[in-house]
Design a protein with these regions (language model features):
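Nucleic-acid endo/exonuclease domains
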Residues: 733-887
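A short beta-strand element within the Helicase C-terminal
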Residues: 475-481, 665-676, 691, 699-702
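ASCE P-loop NTPase helicase motor core
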Residues: 57, 83, 152-265, 322-330, ...
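Helicase C-terminal subdomain and adjacent C-terminal extension
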Residues: 519-558, 679-781
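Conserved helicase/translocase motor-coupling segment
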Residues: 580-649
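Charged C-terminal transducer/switch regions of large nucleotide-driven machines
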Residues: 1-55, 237, 244-249, 253-406
Length: 887
């Protein structure tokens, strides 16, 4: 019968084309087949006979590809493919009303695969061949959610205990929960934050739930790391390393009929006890994690306070009298509020009453102390603030550390790991331990018997571009974990999405993306334009990870915050610069010397092409002879292959390579050789610098040219500023660095003093200005800058012989201040002073003279000063223009 007009399903199979006639009589079907004249009878419920189909000439709108057309017979869809074959399926699994723009995205990726895919010996794209296996998008696959983001995401209710046999921290626990409960979840894993541990625990939980999981990456190194950890726990009997043909062949040849010895069985009562215990331990563990992270943050804050105090004592011309400090042992906030009150109270009877109140009632200072010059009084208060803040931080650290030791004595985390491993092993014993012999699979079984294969080997390893070829075209994994997803290109990632019901995407948007061959750019751009691709699917603009984050902004995402790898001084630059200070640094600072050093080669053109002999000499003659670190634990990173080759010849056994080759690796000492004389987008790329820095565990040395070092508003310049500030060595300058911890606390105390928590000044104009300056500095162009209000001029400008006597007196007055100082975050160096000039106030003779003095002082010390008027518009633009000019 004509299969374009009729559909006959007999005993669940489409038999339309093999039937000559069909007739219903008395609740019985009479069917005559085309190859015989005999008529057979079938019970009514064994046959489905449908007519008058709805024809779809654009099957891509149903998420169907490689097809001429599709016919809808009520709840069935029959697809007629280009190659002459047909397929019948229920319409419930199809995507209804696919928008043409969404269909275009898939077709765009499919055509891109012919351009960007690796070619075989016949010049055929392997990616393209895999794309040709995708006939349709089904609701169950993650690919349908990515291409149709408005489609509801499936959620999973998990009643089983959350296992953590590989160890755990707070962020990792959230990552596991997200992975198990959500169809799509994202793990942002900065370097050294335990991405592999998170992946292992997700694998463990998927096994415990009886599921299978595929672990893929753009290279084998990342997945090999996961495999080796599973090997350590004796779990590789569950793994199949597939992907390319050689891997499949090797795996099939090495199969064994036998299972390993399983752990001794445990009773159901014990299993129930462990399950309940794990649920309770997971709750108790959160208290440990919270306290552990609080201690780490407190250590970071204490370190910053001590470093700033060190700069304060070096920079200030201190006349501190220790016996007065004993009278100022008060809460740090109270000290600053008192200082501000003294600054804002004019000399006279009101000042006298304030002093009486301070030392008679509040017991702060004494009459002798308050007879000192106001400048000295303020200096004592600021010194006491640091001492008190540091003492308080140490007290909190001591208290929290003792509390953590008490909690750790309960061995909560050890029991959690032990019970998790026991339950996992028991579930695997039940799943496999009763089998007498393990089946042996053939290559054909991978295509026709994938479900049984993945029951036996529920952990599959592959590269991202090869995972589609591992099994039959319609097979879906329960879970797919894509590691190093920032390095996976969009086309390959989309292909991987087609093989999974649930996906966990692991990567770091702050690290290197995939590299796009520049010779392909024009072809790619032409396709993007022709298919009218939305920006978040644009191959040139996005890696797979960044595209998913853009397409699915509401997908559960967690940043792994706890960092274990790098010395705190190394990682804290990346933390401040790239991660918004969200990382919790759990590595230890034991006061090691020379953790960070910058070597600046003299001015001059030392680079020739893409190599720099001066840098090679610095490494060979200055850095390496003075290190005690073993050669195998030293790595040299350079942007260019030519410099890499020359370095390798010069330093022999020490490994030199490009930053792309170092991603995912680590060394005790990393030497970054920037090579070029001039800063450019390539060597100053934020992601390259982030990767390069975070390879170093114990020490990092940076080599730059004089020109690169002094190029403003660059990532490398920010890093050099950071290194300089961390060295805590005095810097000869007419402008002092800003004590930002002191003056941030000062601004908060000032707000309390003014009884307006959001106000930093009694003048509305200054409050408005502060708000719009903060808004401007939030923009990417100014991410390395911050602003502080009401900074005393003497804290910024060095009082030297270039100033007149009148200017010195004005500058030394404690009440003389800048309305705002915009400064570099990394070394606290002032960039710009900002004054807010009200018309009436600033046009008095007295104020005009003060403004003249301030302008002259700033000019002599090369500190740019911008005056913003309360009577003029476009002040925001003036500030932006000034910042742009300075940077």
């Amino acid at each position: 019968m004509d299969s374009t007009k009729f559909l006959i399903i007999l005993n669940g199979e489409d038999k339309t084309e093999s039937i000559a006639s069909i007739k219903k009589q008395d609740d019985v079907w009479h069917i005559t087949f085309a190859n015989t004249a005999k008529t057979y009878t079938y019970k009514y419920d064994k046959v489905i006979f449908l007519t008058n189909p709805q024809r779809h000439t654009k099957p891509e709108k149903l998420g169907i590809y490689n097809a001429k057309f599709a016919l809808i017979f009520e709840k069935y869809c029959k697809i007629f493919f280009d190659n002459g074959t047909t397929k019948l399926l229920e319409t419930a699994i199809l995507l209804p009303n696919v928008k043409s723009s969404n269909a275009n995205v898939f077709l765009y990726c499919k055509e891109l695969a012919t351009i960007v895919g690796v070619k075989n010996e016949d010049n055929e794209s392997l990616l393209s061949r895999a794309y040709n296996k995708i006939d349709m998008l089904v609701k169950e696959s993650v690919l349908s959610n990515y291409l149709h983001p408005s489609q509801p995401h499936r959620t999973n209710e998990i009643n089983a205990p959350i296992l953590s046999p590989f160890g755990l921290n707070a962020s990792q626990f959230q990552a596991i929960c997200n992975a198990l409960e959500s169809q799509i979840s994202i793990i942002e894993g900065p370097p050294g934050t335990g991405k592999t541990q998170s992946i292992l625990n997700i694998i463990a939980n998927s096994l415990f739930l009886g599921k299978n999981v595929a672990v893929v990456s753009n290279n084998n190194a990342a997945t090999d790391n996961v495999f080796m950890k599973l090997e350590k726990y004796g779990l590789t009997y569950l793994c199949a390393k597939l992907g390319k043909k050689d891997n499949i062949k090797q795996f099939l040849q090495n199969q064994s009929h036998t299972y390993p010895d399983f752990a001794q069985s445990i009773t159901q009562e014990r299993k129930d006890t462990f399950s309940q215990a794990i649920k309770k331990l997971n709750i108790q563990a959160q208290e440990i994690f919270t306290l552990q992270n609080a201690i780490a943050k407190q250590k970071t804050m204490l370190s910053a306070l001590e470093l700033e105090f060190h700069h304060f004592t070096m920079q200030e011309n201190l006349t501190i009298r220790p016996h007065f400090l004993t009278l100022l042992q008060k809460d740090s906030t109270l000290l600053l509020k008192t200082k501000i009150a003294l600054e804002n109270t004019p000399k006279g009877w009101r000042y006298f009453l304030l002093v009486c109140k301070l030392f008679l009632i509040q017991r702060i200072g004494n009459f002798t102390f308050y007879k000192l010059p106001l400048q000295d009084i303020i200096q004592h208060f600021e010194y006491a603030y640091y001492m008190q803040s540091i003492a308080t931080a140490r007290e909190i650290l001591t208290h929290d550390t003792k509390r953590l030791e008490i909690l750790r004595d309960t061995q909560t985390l050890e029991h959690l790991q032990e019970y998790s491993l026991t339950l996992l092993q028991e579930s695997l014993r039940i799943r496999y331990g009763t089998h007498t012999q393990r089946p042996i699979f053939s290559e054909k079984d991978l295509l026709t018997n994938a479900e049984q294969f993945c029951d036996e080997y529920p952990i599959i390893f592959s590269t991202t571009h090869a995972i589609k070829n591992c099994f039959g075209r319609d097979f879906l994994f329960d879970y797919l974990i894509i590691d190093e997803a920032s390095q996976v290109d969009l086309v390959t990632g989309v292909l991987a999405l087609s093989v999974a019901r649930n996906i966990v995407i692991v990567g770091d948007t702050k690290q290197l993306p995939n590299v796009i061959d520049s010779t392909m750019s024009q072809q790619i751009q032409e396709l993007t334009t022709r298919y009218k691709i939305p920006p978040h699917y644009d191959y040139m603009q996005h890696s797979f990870l960044s595209s998913v984050c853009s397409v699915l902004p509401n997908a559960p995402s967690v940043l792994l915050k706890e960092h274990y790898r790098c010395h705190p001084k190394i990682i804290n630059f990346c933390n401040q610069k790239f991660y918004g200070s969200e990382l919790v640094i759990l590595s230890e600072d034991n006061g090691e010397a020379n953790v960070l050093e910058a070597y600046v080669s003299p001015a001059g053109n030392h680079a020739r092409g893409h190599y720099n002999q001066r840098e090679i000499d610095i490494i060979a003659n200055e850095i390496l002879p003075n290190t005690t670190i073993e050669p195998q634990e030293i790595g040299i990173i350079t942007p260019y292959n030519e410099q890499k080759a020359r370095l390798q010849n010069a330093v022999g056994e020490i490994e030199a390579d490009t930053v792309h080759k170092y991603q995912g690796r680590e060394k005790d000492l990393i030497i970054i050789a920037t090579t070029d004389n001039q800063s450019n987008d390539f060597i100053d790329d934020s992601k390259m610098l982030n990767v390069a820095i975070t390879r170093a565990k114990k020490q990092l040395k940076l080599i730059v040219s004089y020109e690169v070092c002094h190029k403003q508003n660059t990532n490398i310049n920010d890093f050099i500023r950071y290194i300089t500030y961390q060295s805590a060595k005095p810097i000869e300058s007419k402008i002092y660095s800003i004590f930002d911890l002191l003056y941030k606390a000062n601004a908060q105390a000032r707000a309390l003093y003014l009884k307006g928590k959001r106000r930093i000044s009694q003048f509305d104009s200054e409050n408005i200005a502060f708000a719009f300056i903060k808004d401007i500095l939030q923009q990417d162009s100014y991410h390395s800058l911050d602003v502080l209000p009401h900074i005393p001029l003497a804290k910024v400008i060095k009082i030297d012989e270039t100033l007149t006597q009148e200017e010195k007196l004005y500058a030394q007055n404690p009440l003389t201040h800048f309305d705002f100082i915009i400064y570099h975050i990394m070394d606290k160096a002032p960039l710009l002073a900002v004054e807010i000039d009200g018309y009436a106030f600033h046009h008095t003779h007295k104020q005009l003279n003060r403004d003249r003095l301030k302008d002259s002082i700033c000019k002599k010390h090369n500190l740019p000063l911008l005056r913003l008027s309360t009577t003029q518009s476009a002040e925001s633009k003036r500030l932006k223009d000034m910042l742009q000019a300075l940077l």
